């Protein structure tokens, strides 16, 4: 009774592993692909060679100016085919041609809608910020005023408390940006 399940298991695994371990004929598949590529290349070269100028009138028309830059070429120019007559027909990446045609329409920076909203909010903030005064009124800075400066100026502030470091001196000619103002306020 136990021999039947073991035999079935053995035959099943042999059939399964036999399929996986079968040798693939890689050389035959490669040969097929190579022949297909060579045939298509031969047809392409035949078409291109028939389109070359052969008459004297075509030569007198003048040289044809190509619009191919060295960085647009897909392959390296050191290939053995570079000296052949079809070297003039170099394949070019298509997206570069389309980008070069529309250079005036390109804009730098973020193109997402969220970036546009953020830029607009930033511009509105800067336009409305020019009317604001950067310094506090004198009545609030005095020792009778309120806030952190009053607490610092009171005599009992030094008992048992450590004060923050004084602000660093500003560099001459450096712009007084919002970030520096916030940092200076936090250090006071």
From Swiss-Prot:
Positions of disulphide bridges: 110-115
Keyword check for Signal: yes
Pfam families xrefs: Calc_CGRP_IAPP (PF00214)
Positions carrying Arginine amide: 41
Propeptide: 45-92, 153-188
BP terms from Gene Ontology: adenylate cyclase-activating G protein-coupled receptor signaling pathway; adrenomedullin receptor signaling pathway; positive regulation of heart rate; regulation of systemic arterial blood pressure
GO molecular function, one term: adrenomedullin receptor binding
Compartment list: Secreted
Recorded coiled-coil stretches: none
Region annotation (Disordered) ranges: 69-89, 129-175
Signal peptide interval: 1-21
Tyrosine amide carried by residues: 146
This protein's UniProt keywords: Amidation, Cleavage on pair of basic residues, Disulfide bond, Hormone, Secreted, Signal
UniProt-listed InterPro entries: Adrenomedullin-reg_peptide, Calcitonin/adrenomedullin, Pro-ADM
GO cellular component annotations of the record: extracellular space
Site, as annotated: Required for CALCRL receptor interaction: 116, 125
Family: Belongs to the adrenomedullin family.
Function of the protein: Numerous actions have been reported most related to the physiologic control of fluid and electrolyte homeostasis.
Name this polypeptide is given: Pro-adrenomedullin
Organism expressing this protein natively: Bos taurus
């Amino acid at each position: 009774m136990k021999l039947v399940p073991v035999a079935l298991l053995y035959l099943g695994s042999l059939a399964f592993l036999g399929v996986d371990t079968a040798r693939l004929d890689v050389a035959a598949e490669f040969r097929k692909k190579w022949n297909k590529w060579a045939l298509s290349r031969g047809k392409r070269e035949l078409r291109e060679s028939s389109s070359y100028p052969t008459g004297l009138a075509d030569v007198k028309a003048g040289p044809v100016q190509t619009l191919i830059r060295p960085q647009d070429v897909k392959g390296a120019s050191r290939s053995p085919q570079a000296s052949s007559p079809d070297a003039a027909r170099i394949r070019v990446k298509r997206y570069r041609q389309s980008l070069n045609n529309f250079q005036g329409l390109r804009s730098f920076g973020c193109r997402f809608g969220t970036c546009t909203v953020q830029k607009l909010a930033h511009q509105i903030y800067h336009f409305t910020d020019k009317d604001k005064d950067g310094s506090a009124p004198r009545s609030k800075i005095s020792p009778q005023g309120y806030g952190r400066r009053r607490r610092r100026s009171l005599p009992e502030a030094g008992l048992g408390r450590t004060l923050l470091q004084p602000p660093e001196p500003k560099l001459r000619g450096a712009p007084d940006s919002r970030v520096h103002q916030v940092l200076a306020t936090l250090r006071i």
